[in-house]
């Protein structure tokens, strides 16, 4: 076992697993008598190792080898030259440091030695200068495997196509816009910004755009990625000193699709690179599609210049599908799996799973798997049994009068206002919301709901549902109110 191997065991005990794997494990240390050369991957990595972990490395090597030693920090990838920083350690090494810079080429060796000086800076501070360049999370993503190969973006999944996307009032505008940009990229809706909660189909739509655009134009250069991968690509290009290639690849795309763009907020280096990438693509008429869990203005920490550019094109929402759409999703999913699902079972699952499409499909898979394993048909009874620990099946179903009370309390009006003939906006809008909630949360027919709201016609209920669905796509305040009420009533 080498001296450095012994040191690694001791260092590992003093660091988190993440720090050890990210910063210490990748470096290579070569020993030649009393000279220890710490090989780092580039200038940034060398500076970070030396400033953040220099004291720990020095004291650990002293413990395993003795005080009489020299530590040399080397940047192997410095173009045309090898830059080293040498620390000579003696009995006072913890308090004094002698630093020299050695620049080597074929003709001469030059060494300049500075006088020893007391350092007032602590190497144990939490944030190095790298964070000023990239932001903490970006810096911590950098690894130092010099021979590691990397590529840009992520593959598109063939299963995500428009034909498998179930359309309803909550997503039809987003779906129509997605189809348009896949046929005529860069012509309309640039950028296309799709926002909505997790598991509602944003990624499906985004990848469907890429897959369909590739069918329309097989020669189109399509890059799909998410913000996490974009950050990794960016910091890897810095680590490998290959930023030109990163920029060449991303800025030469005909269609750029980035999922969960909200995660670049607060990542200064990545946000700046994305800003320039956006500008380059937009000015060249290339299509940009972005998704987020929030409306652009609501993404905390997102630079104003990016918020402004996201507004250049079309912003559309994908909301939780209504009951009918949820049933349609379940029936289609079962059909795609080659399974028969009774309509009443689909309705039962749809009524009780209202969080997102992903959990809806997960519940379906559980019901189908359980029924198949037990050699039973997927009846409501089977669904009740196997989903008991997944969904809270209320002993009493949601009633319209409860919906009316919750909505009235929320908007500080009276229940009788909701059933009255008043048409003022402060009454009419809550009434429409209450009708829409009743349609989604109960099994009552349109005439029954209309009757509960002062004997109104079923067409009035239909109009209310359509109006609120449309408003939820364009008005974040209405959308937020609706989701909050949905949560209150469903508890």
Swiss-Prot record:
Which superkingdom, per the lineage?
Bacteria
Domain IV, binds dsDNA: annotated segments? 372-491
Q: Where in the cell is it found?
A: Cytoplasm
Q: Locate the region Domain III, AAA+ region.
A: 155-371
Name the keywords, alphabetized.
ATP-binding, Cytoplasm, DNA replication, DNA-binding, Lipid-binding, Nucleotide-binding
Q: Name one GO biological process term.
A: regulation of DNA replication
Cytoplasm as a keyword of this entry, yes or no, is yes
User: Which parts of the sequence bind ATP?
Assistant: 199, 201-203
One Gene Ontology cellular component annotation held by this UniProt entry: plasma membrane
UniProt-recorded Gene Ontology molecular function terms: ATP binding; ATP hydrolysis activity; DNA replication origin binding; lipid binding
InterPro entries in the record: AAA+_ATPase, Chromosome_initiator_DnaA, Chromosome_initiator_DnaA-like, Chromosome_initiator_DnaA_CS, DnaA_C, DnaA_dom, DnaA_N_dom, DnaA_N_sf
UniProt region (Domain I, interacts with DnaA modulators), positions on chain: 1-69
Q: Where is this region: Domain II?
A: 69-154
Its quaternary organisation is: Oligomerizes as a right-handed, spiral filament on DNA at oriC.
Functional summary from the UniProt entry = Plays an essential role in the initiation and regulation of chromosomal replication. ATP-DnaA binds to the origin of replication (oriC) to initiate formation of the DNA replication initiation complex once per cell cycle. Binds the DnaA box (a 9 base pair repeat at the origin) and separates the double-stranded (ds)DNA. Forms a right-handed helical filament on oriC DNA; dsDNA binds to the exterior of the filament while single-stranded (ss)DNA is stabiized in the filament's interior.
Q: What is known of its domains?
A: Domain I is involved in oligomerization and binding regulators, domain II is flexibile and of varying length in different bacteria, domain III forms the AAA+ region, while domain IV binds dsDNA.
| Record-stated family | Belongs to the DnaA family.
Its protein name is Chromosomal replication initiator protein DnaA
This protein's species is: Francisella tularensis subsp. holarctica (strain OSU18)
